Amino acid sequence: MWLGVVTLFPEMFRAVTDFGVTGRAVSNGLLELQTWNPRDFTHDKHRTVDDRPYGGGPGMLMMVQPLRDAIHAAKVAAGDKAKVIYLSPQGRKLTQQGVEELAKSERLILVCGRYEGIDERIIQTEVDEEWSIGDYVLSGGELPAMTLIDSVSRLVPGVLGKQASAEQDSFSDGLLDCPHYTRPESLDGIDVPAVLLSGNHENIRRWRLQQSLGRTLLRRPELFENLALTDEQTKLLAEFVNTAQAGE
């Protein structure tokens, strides 16, 4: 997968290229990331990249010409086949479903805003989609871009050691993940659930699914609004509720 990033702080993306899962993906040639800094497209000695907004008000906007030229350079490198995404609090909220949609793209260009944002005409003429990682304000689009890159790259074939790791993640099936345990079998008097030590794969699968359903009900019940439960899921959830009520 090829990713282009337009950013005033390309150094920040070493967190993607040099570390962890994404770093290994880059090293193995499964993920390619290039950056374009609008400062490199300025024409004044101060390398100015901000400008005053029409109508006044506090703050500055990213200057149109350097930003637009940087986006154009990224498009040329992508062969004009890439989808251009602007990271914005006004965009579509990123969910696992959205991540799966974006992961189908072979090439993405991510535009990271700074200051008070970017000129609306840039969004109208250069941007294909706007995406947000949540209803809160950050200093720029770099952290949202890295969040998007990390989540999308996990779905690129070969990036994870086992594709099942991605399939079992929270939200991959619309539910929260089940609890996980490793050694030792007993920690501060709390034992690993016996079913996980049983070796019975079907019982383990059912337990994990039931825990996933129950945890979602307790912590994020609104997620069920978009789910159509199977007969098995309905039965397991009912058992979870009955057990929880009996233990009260």
Curated annotation (Swiss-Prot):
SUPFAM superfamilies: alpha/beta knot. The keyword Cell membrane does not apply. It holds the Pfam family tRNA_m1G_MT. InterPro entries: Alpha/beta_knot_MTases, tRNA_m1G_MeTrfase_C_sf, tRNA_m1G_MeTrfase_TrmD, tRNA_m1G_MTases_N, tRNA_MeTrfase_TRMD/TRM10. It comes from the Bacteria. The keyword Cytoplasm applies. Coiled coil: none annotated. S-adenosyl-L-methionine binds at G113, I133, G134, D135, Y136, V137, L138. GO terms for molecular function: tRNA (guanine(37)-N1)-methyltransferase activity. Homodimer. Belongs to the RNA methyltransferase TrmD family. Specifically methylates guanosine-37 in various tRNAs. HAMAP family: TrmD (MF_00605). This is tRNA (guanine-N(1)-)-methyltransferase. It comes from Shewanella loihica (strain ATCC BAA-1088 / PV-4).
